[in-house]
UniProtKB/Swiss-Prot annotation:
It comes from Saccharomyces cerevisiae (strain ATCC 204508 / S288c) (Baker's yeast). It is a multi-pass membrane protein. This is Putative uncharacterized membrane protein YGR290W. Residues 38-105 are cytoplasmic. It is found in: Membrane.
Amino acid sequence: MDHRAAFGYFSNACFKVMLFSSLLASFASSVAFISLITFSLSSSESPNWAELVVNSKWSSSKALSFFPSSKSSVLKTSCWFTISLEDSEMFLSSFFEAAFFLLTNEMIFFILYYFFSCLMFFYVASERNTNPKILQTINTKPLYIKN
């Protein structure tokens, strides 16, 4: 196999690996984004959701205020939510932390992708300048010098 064809297969494989890793990173960062938001909502300052489902009552001074209902294992559909100022500030801070994590994670993979693609571009450009056989493969007709 020619070294140019091997480099073409290698660059194609690198492109597919970088694309797959970028998709995997975006999926992982979105999962981390969702889990960070749910963790911030279920932290120690917020109510315990398992207790809330079992007891089905919560005081209005806390983060959530439910419609009064009897003690049952399932929350009734007639409940309403009021979010206090402290919980909204905590939610916004965790939202910005998760957005920053998502942005930095994606930017790292895009910087790596563009670095490798620029490296491959410069390799091919330098190979075209130094190796005249590549110029012959670009042209469809060979050049003949007439006397």
